[in-house]
């Protein structure tokens, strides 16, 4: 008999400064343990942000996608963190996320219409950033919470859901 599929929340914490957008967590998202039946993913992400010492800098958080990863269901969140100064000065391990980077890695692998997508981690991050860009146009409260620098650096991105996996 098969076991139940674990639900694993992940958060991609990003911050913006005058230089650009940065992935505060470095090279990957932060993931929690499986969600207990008396909890839920959003709460687990808040606990993870507290454990990482960044909850007090949270400007906004939004669930952007989900995917299957082996025996797990990954629930993805983007967290926009506030930085009053240069991001690298606050989080030395932060990595820049630029439009050039997203262009350089190209589109996700193509799949047939009846197949599940198999996104790379960079595709998940790119989708999350484009989702934030979409919120700039559709959700005034979240757009305001992002702050002017994040909005400025997200502006060149276009929401690209339809056709993202097309050849």
Regions found by a protein language model. Give the residues of each.
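Polar low-complexity intrinsically disordered regions
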Residues: 1, 45-47, 122-128
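N-terminal strand-loop-strand
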Residues: 1-31, 56-61, 78-85
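Glutamate identity and glutamate-enriched acidic tracts
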Residues: 10, 40, 44-48, 84, ...
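Nudix hydrolase/Nudix homology domain
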Residues: 24-36, 67-167
């Amino acid at each position: 008999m098969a076991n139940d599929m674990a639900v694993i929340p992940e958060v991609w914490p990003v911050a913006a400064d005058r230089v650009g957008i940065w992935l505060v967590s470095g090279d990957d998202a932060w993931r929690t343990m499986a969600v207990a039946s008396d909890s839920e993913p959003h709460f687990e992400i808040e606990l993870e942000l507290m454990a990482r010492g960044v909850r007090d800098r949270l400007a906004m958080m939004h669930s952007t996608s989900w995917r299957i990863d082996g025996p797990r269901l990954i629930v993805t969140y983007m967290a926009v963190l506030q930085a009053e100064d240069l991001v690298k000065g606050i989080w030395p391990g932060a990595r820049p996320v630029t439009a050039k980077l997203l262009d350089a890695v190209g589109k996700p692998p193509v799949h047939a219409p009846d197949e599940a997508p198999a996104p790379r981690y960079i595709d998940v991050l790119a989708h999350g950033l484009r989702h934030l860009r979409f919120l700039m146009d559709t959700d005034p409260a979240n757009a305001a919470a992002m702050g002017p620098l994040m909005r400025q650096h997200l502006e060149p991105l276009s929401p690209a859901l339809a056709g993202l996996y097309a050849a």
